[in-house]
């Protein structure tokens, strides 16, 4: 069983890397068009926050080096995505986006890490408390792409709900859910089980709207901007 869980964990790491890399096409489009258009920033902000804390969890928890390395990679990738957003976001939305980034990607991680180190004296308690926080954030991470559903329904187009991000989040939830079952790890099972079902929901929505009529572009060839954050 230990060998099986190891191999499942390795597969999970590979899929996690694909999750972190899946938005590359989206951000290449943003760079080419020099506009964030109607893409949502919140999913990447949430994923950066989650990856940062999972990296810390992997560092302070014995035997979890794979968790820290893959999430360290994820934190780096998401940082690049967020910086690209900040560079191309319309001026009217720049300040609001910066405030959210500072609150969720700087202030909250510092408070969470400092709080667990202050309130819990032994390493096991600190690890468990951080695991609980990370599990909660994972649920947010899996659900954050749902913020794009309003845009999909309004425009009847899946252009701004990236398929590969939803697909790999679905796979990620499935494989890590199996891994959690093998190890009887509730911190992993609950968020990844929910991620599995949320992934199915997103894929069903994508399938429903994928043949819809393209949205109408303005005279400059760009879609009018809407708030990046709901």
From Swiss-Prot:
<dbReference type="GO" id="GO:0051119">
    <property type="term" value="F:sugar transmembrane transporter activity"/>
</dbReference>
<dbReference type="GO" id="GO:0008515">
    <property type="term" value="F:sucrose transmembrane transporter activity"/>
</dbReference>
<dbReference type="GO" id="GO:0009744">
    <property type="term" value="P:response to sucrose"/>
</dbReference>
<feature type="domain" description="MtN3/slv 2">
    <location>
        <begin position="129"/>
        <end position="212"/>
    </location>
</feature>
<feature type="topological domain" description="Extracellular">
    <location>
        <begin position="184"/>
        <end position="185"/>
    </location>
</feature>
<keyword id="KW-0813">Transport</keyword>
<comment type="function">
    <text>Mediates both low-affinity uptake and efflux of sugar across the vacuolar membrane. Regulates sugars homeostasis in leaves and roots by exporting/importing them through the tonoplast regarding metabolic demand. Acts as a vacuolar hexose transporter, such as glucose (Glc), fructose (Fru), and sucrose (Suc).</text>
</comment>
<feature type="topological domain" description="Cytoplasmic">
    <location>
        <begin position="207"/>
        <end position="230"/>
    </location>
</feature>
<feature type="transmembrane region" description="Helical; Name=2">
    <location>
        <begin position="41"/>
        <end position="61"/>
    </location>
</feature>
<keyword id="KW-0926">Vacuole</keyword>
<dbReference type="GO" id="GO:0051260">
    <property type="term" value="P:protein homooligomerization"/>
</dbReference>
<feature type="transmembrane region" description="Helical; Name=4">
    <location>
        <begin position="94"/>
        <end position="114"/>
    </location>
</feature>
<keyword id="KW-0472">Membrane</keyword>
<dbReference type="InterPro" id="IPR004316">
    <property type="entry name" value="SWEET_rpt"/>
</dbReference>
<dbReference type="GO" id="GO:0005353">
    <property type="term" value="F:fructose transmembrane transporter activity"/>
</dbReference>
<keyword id="KW-1133">Transmembrane helix</keyword>
<dbReference type="GO" id="GO:0009705">
    <property type="term" value="C:plant-type vacuole membrane"/>
</dbReference>
<dbReference type="GO" id="GO:0009409">
    <property type="term" value="P:response to cold"/>
</dbReference>
<feature type="topological domain" description="Cytoplasmic">
    <location>
        <begin position="150"/>
        <end position="162"/>
    </location>
</feature>
<keyword id="KW-0812">Transmembrane</keyword>
<feature type="transmembrane region" description="Helical; Name=5">
    <location>
        <begin position="129"/>
        <end position="149"/>
    </location>
</feature>
<dbReference type="GO" id="GO:0006995">
    <property type="term" value="P:cellular response to nitrogen starvation"/>
</dbReference>
<feature type="transmembrane region" description="Helical; Name=7">
    <location>
        <begin position="186"/>
        <end position="206"/>
    </location>
</feature>
<feature type="topological domain" description="Extracellular">
    <location>
        <begin position="1"/>
        <end position="3"/>
    </location>
</feature>
<comment type="similarity">
    <text>Belongs to the SWEET sugar transporter family.</text>
</comment>
<dbReference type="GO" id="GO:0009749">
    <property type="term" value="P:response to glucose"/>
</dbReference>
<dbReference type="InterPro" id="IPR047664">
    <property type="entry name" value="SWEET"/>
</dbReference>
<dbReference type="Pfam" id="PF03083">
    <property type="entry name" value="MtN3_slv"/>
</dbReference>
<feature type="topological domain" description="Cytoplasmic">
    <location>
        <begin position="25"/>
        <end position="40"/>
    </location>
</feature>
<feature type="transmembrane region" description="Helical; Name=1">
    <location>
        <begin position="4"/>
        <end position="24"/>
    </location>
</feature>
<feature type="topological domain" description="Extracellular">
    <location>
        <begin position="115"/>
        <end position="128"/>
    </location>
</feature>
<dbReference type="GO" id="GO:1902334">
    <property type="term" value="P:fructose export from vacuole to cytoplasm"/>
</dbReference>
<feature type="transmembrane region" description="Helical; Name=6">
    <location>
        <begin position="163"/>
        <end position="183"/>
    </location>
</feature>
<feature type="topological domain" description="Cytoplasmic">
    <location>
        <begin position="91"/>
        <end position="93"/>
    </location>
</feature>
<feature type="domain" description="MtN3/slv 1">
    <location>
        <begin position="6"/>
        <end position="92"/>
    </location>
</feature>
<feature type="transmembrane region" description="Helical; Name=3">
    <location>
        <begin position="70"/>
        <end position="90"/>
    </location>
</feature>
<keyword id="KW-0762">Sugar transport</keyword>
<feature type="topological domain" description="Extracellular">
    <location>
        <begin position="62"/>
        <end position="69"/>
    </location>
</feature>
<dbReference type="GO" id="GO:0009750">
    <property type="term" value="P:response to fructose"/>
</dbReference>
<dbReference type="GO" id="GO:0055056">
    <property type="term" value="F:D-glucose transmembrane transporter activity"/>
</dbReference>
<dbReference type="GO" id="GO:0005886">
    <property type="term" value="C:plasma membrane"/>
</dbReference>
<keyword id="KW-0677">Repeat</keyword>
């Amino acid at each position: 069983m230990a060998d099986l869980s190891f191999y499942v964990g390795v597969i999970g790491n590979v899929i996690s890397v694909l999750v972190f890399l899946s938005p590359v096409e989206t951000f290449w489009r943003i760079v080419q068009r020099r506009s964030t258009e109607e893409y949502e920033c919140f999913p990447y902000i949430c994923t950066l926050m989650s990856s940062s804390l999972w990296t810390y969890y992997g560092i302070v928890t014995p035997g979890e080096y794979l968790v820290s390395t893959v999430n360290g990679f994820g934190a780096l990738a998401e940082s690049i995505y967020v910086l690209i957003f900040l560079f191309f976001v319309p001026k009217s939305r720049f300040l609001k986006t910066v405030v959210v980034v500072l609150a969720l990607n700087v202030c909250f991680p510092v408070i969470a890490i400092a709080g667990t180190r202050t309130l819990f004296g032994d390493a096991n308690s600190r690890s468990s408390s951080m695991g609980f926080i990370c599990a909660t954030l994972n649920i947010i991470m899996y659900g954050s792409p749902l913020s794009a559903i309003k845009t999909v329904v309004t425009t009847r187009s899946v252009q701004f709900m990236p398929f590969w991000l939803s697909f790999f989040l679905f796979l990620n939830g499935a494989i890590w859910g199996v891994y959690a079952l093998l190890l009887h790890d509730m911190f992993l099972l609950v968020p990844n089980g929910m991620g599995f079902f949320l992934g199915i929901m997103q894929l069903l929505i994508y399938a429903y709207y994928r043949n819809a009529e393209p949205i109408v572009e303005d005279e400059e060839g760009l879609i009018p901007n809407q708030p990046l954050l709901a």
